[in-house]
Amino acid sequence: MANKKPLRREEVPVELTWDLSAIYESNEGFEKDLEFVKSQIPAVAAAKDTALKDGASLLAFLNLLNVVDDKIETAYVYSHLKADQDTSNNENQVLNQRAFSTYIEFSGASAWFAPAILALSDEEFEEYFKQEPGLEDFRVLLETARIKKGHVLSDKEEALLSKASEVFQGASKTFNLLNNADIKFDEITTEDGEKVELTNGNYSVYIESKNQDVRKEAFETLYKPYINLKNTFASTLGTEVKGHNFSALVHNYDSARQAALASNQVPEEVYDALVDVVNEKLPLLHRYIALQQKALGLDELHMYDLYVPITGDAPIKYNYQEASLASVEALKPLGEEYHEIMKKAYADRWIDVAENIGKRSGGYSSGAYSTAPYILLNWHDELSNFFTLVHELGHSAHSYFTRNTQPKQYGDYSIFLAEIASTTNENILTDYLLKKHTDKEAQKYILNNYLHRFKSTIFRQTQFAEFEHKIHVMDQEGQPLTQESIAKAYSEINAKYYANVIQDEQIAYEWARIPHFYMNYYVFQYATGMAAATALSDKILHGTPEDLEAYLNYLRAGRSDAPIEVMKKAGVDMTKKDYLYDAFDVFEKRLAQLEALMSE
């Protein structure tokens, strides 16, 4: 499929669109499910008075929740996929808004349930299981609802905190408005001598320029307004951190990190192991950066030189037809069952391929328990799009395995686990491409693509995670979070990670433009996810049939166990350091291969 001017939705060939008729043959099915959900909302709300009467009543309510949730989830997915395929279609936007409004109503009607389960004593909780053995099918779900026991205040106190939630979100909202709407950048001069206004959107183009003067000007121009507003950004970030620490304190946690990780049942050892091993392996990052410097022929490397491609443009391209066939072939190491799911994805038209006018940008995998796991793409004949395709196929296969193994209540998976399956696929594709494209330039490009992803995901996100924890600890210990103290903390960590790079003064204020620091200990999961995926893909490619079966069992597990326990069964104990060392072994091997090719 060639890259052409985007088509109108009705002009896209049917074979390049997803088949939503597999959900509902027409909107009539959507309307029927929506009406059913609305009819059940009063019963869901009224069950507050009866559901906890005894074990049988609780089981009946949980089964009702499953049925209603399945219907609203299906209706919502159908409507949001239709809305995303053409955002200019008002009828589909209205459909999506109606489904979302109904979902909010349903969520409100069932909101009483989790606090009610949480309020039970351990004895009362276990009594329900004695009365009704059928509740064992829901035990993990119910126990997960109780993980905050001991960390919940009285109803009156929680209600008071809830009313203050908008206040606690104020710093993040202010940052987003500043960063996305109010910040304006000066013009820069391009390689062609043209004056253009710098934006957050086009910055990546100019920071990758082959002209160092363009890179330097883009870098300095980007940071100028952030430095001008450094006290304001220090105030928003400091207030955000104080909010996290306050919430943790009043809810009886030792720290904000403990509170944030507890909600996903992730032990703090996972975080510490990541930071420890990445720090131990920083010499590998320094080696990769030295290779970049040598390839660019620079006497010294600045922060604005780190994003220049060192292997040129991609020497290989795939159109969609080629990529679809190659993806099925590339993922064969995942076994016959996985292979059949890949063929099914194409045969049953799970994938909406072509870019069209009004289509949502980017790519994703989305589905409900009772639907196929659909994939949205905006295809261009570029190698990066091939990686996006196998990435999203990884999410969809994960969803398919989970939903075809687990009951509704365990039929999805946590954010902590989500990126592992998709990144595993990317790593397996890298191995396939290295075997298929053996000429020197292709090998260099594929290897550097992998190393750059590893650097951006594991090294950089761990750097962010280390800084995020540092400023939370500073505040908890009573140290003021001023622009000076924040910049000092950031620059010290950055200098450690990029020890062989000139520390341009602007980089001390990089923290001011990073939205992840307002996401409360979220960013580390990018790094743990890729590290686990790297270790797992290596086991799949070079291990035993038992290694593959353990991986497939992770795909099947859903929410049937805590995320850390699911990964242990897959062969990766994320509370220990072994999987991280395995991942860095792969990185070092790939780095040595690229070093050898670049020195020829």
Q: How would you describe each model-predicted region?
A:
Residues 1-312, 596-600:
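A well-structured
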Residues 10-12, 25, 113, 117, ...:
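C-terminal, non-catalytic "cap/extension" segments appended to globular domains
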Residues 295-333, 339, 350, 374, ...:
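Long, K/E/R/D-enriched contiguous segments that form extended
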Residues 313-318, 351-371:
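Catalytic zinc-binding patch centered on the HExxH motif and its immediate surroundings
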Residues 316-320, 368-390:
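Short pre-active-site segment immediately N-terminal to the catalytic Zn-binding motif
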Residues 329, 333-340, 363-366, 395, ...:
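Conserved helix-loop functional segments at active or binding sites
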Residues 374-378, 405-415, 444-453, 472-474, ...:
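Short beta-alpha connecting loops at secondary-structure transitions
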Residues 387, 399-423:
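Post-HEXXH active-site segment of zinc metalloproteases
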